[in-house]
């Protein structure tokens, strides 16, 4: 029988298991499904973000072919919220520590949305010995002006109405927002420890003027990279995708129409199939070169 830290979710056609691991002293929650080469999914940095709400419709598709691990980032979901400065360096360190703690047999592929994409990118540059491939989806990491559509995220006021505004900013205009999504994200966001961590995270981003790297750092990405972007992304404009493609030598692009910042939520099958196609192609090339 599974203990409470290994509860099976039956919310999707392929069950995933919730587990926890100590990653560099940070108790870290993750969901796991499938077998094979490991693929790590990393959610974005909006209030109330966590692995299940962001990836529940993608996990079962990817898990038909891979061992899928969807983690809660430092300060989000059910992962611990230590009293630290929530910088990008700390998020990179946490992801590195998580990968090491999982004791994977070989390298991992990283799939990240927004802040999660930027964090995966950082690990791929600084710890390339751990990473096989990278998927950036609506990724942060390049300079984006803190414009009006970012304000519901950066200045989230911890009200339910504010959560509705946040989700509207993150999705395309035709996306139907349901109460279950709002209620779940609002519950996570207003947890006292999560709230404190989120305020610290957004304060750091405001002080830095955004979440970005020097372009020369991005040029150092050494692994094959798929850049996925919603054509109607209001938070990180689609032009950013082309900048990533220009900077990362071994990169492919996939633009999804009628899609905002959340391809994995707005168009989960399209996004998952594009990711599978990319990962399988990379595996074929790797086998041919062996």
From Swiss-Prot:
Its EC number is 3.7.1.13. It comes from the Bacteria. Optimum pH is between 7.0 and 7.5. One of its GO terms (molecular function) is hydrolase activity, acting on acid carbon-carbon bonds, in ketonic substances. Disulfide bonds: none annotated. Keywords: Aromatic hydrocarbons catabolism, Hydrolase, Plasmid. InterPro entries: AB_hydrolase_1, AB_hydrolase_fold. The active site is at residues 114, 233, 261. Pathway: Xenobiotic degradation; carbazole degradation. One of its GO terms (biological process) is carbazole catabolic process. Optimum temperature is 58 degrees Celsius. The keyword Hydrolase applies. It catalyses: (2E,4E)-6-(2-aminophenyl)-2-hydroxy-6-oxohexa-2,4-dienoate + H2O = (2E)-2-hydroxypenta-2,4-dienoate + anthranilate + H(+). Belongs to the DmpD/TodF/XylF esterase family. Homodimer. Involved in the degradation of carbazole, a toxic N-heterocyclic aromatic compound containing dibenzopyrrole system. Catalyzes the hydrolytic cleavage of a carbon-carbon bond of 2-hydroxy-6-oxo-6-(2'-aminophenyl)hexa-2,4-dienoic acid (HOPDA) to yield anthranilate. CarC is specific for 2-hydroxy-6-oxo-6-phenylhexa-2,4-dienoic acid (6-phenyl-HODA), and has little activity toward 2-hydroxy-6-oxohepta-2,4-dienoic acid and 2-hydroxymuconic semialdehyde. This is 2-hydroxy-6-oxo-6-(2'-aminophenyl)hexa-2,4-dienoic acid hydrolase. It comes from Metapseudomonas resinovorans (Pseudomonas resinovorans). The gene is carC.
């Amino acid at each position: 029988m599974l203990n409470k830290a290994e509860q099976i979710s039956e919310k999707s056609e392929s069950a995933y298991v919730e587990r926890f691991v100590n990653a560099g002293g940070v108790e870290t929650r993750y969901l796991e499904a499938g077998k094979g080469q490991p693929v790590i999914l990393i959610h974005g940095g909006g209030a109330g973000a966590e692995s299940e709400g962001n990836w529940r419709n993608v996990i079962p598709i990817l898990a038909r072919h891979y061992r899928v691990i969807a983690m809660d980032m430092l300060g989000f979901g059910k992962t611990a919220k230590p009293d630290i400065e929530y910088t990008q360096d700390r998020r990179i360190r946490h992801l590195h520590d998580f990968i090491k703690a999982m004791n994977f047999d070989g390298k991992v592929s990283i799939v990240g949305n927004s802040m999660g994409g930027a964090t995966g990118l950082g690990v791929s540059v600084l710890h390339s010995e751990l990473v096989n491939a990278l998927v950036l989806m609506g990724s942060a990491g390049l300079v984006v002006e803190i414009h009006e559509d970012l304000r519901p995220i950066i200045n989230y006021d911890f009200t339910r109405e504010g959560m509705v505004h946040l989700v509207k900013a993150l999705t395309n205009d035709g996306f139907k927002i349901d109460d279950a999504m709002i209620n779940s994200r609002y519950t996570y966001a207003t947890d006292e420890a999560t709230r404190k961590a989120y305020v610290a995270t957004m304060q750091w981003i405001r002080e830095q003027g955004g979440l970005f790297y020097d372009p020369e750092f991005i040029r150092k990405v050494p692994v094959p990279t798929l850049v996925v972007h919603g054509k109607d992304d209001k938070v990180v404009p689609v032009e950013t995708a082309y900048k990533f493609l220009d900077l990362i030598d071994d990169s492919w692009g996939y633009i999804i129409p009628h899609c905002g910042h959340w391809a994995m939520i707005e168009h989960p099958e399209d996004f998952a199939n594009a990711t599978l196609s990319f990962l399988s192609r990379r595996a074929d090339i790797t086998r041919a070169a062996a």
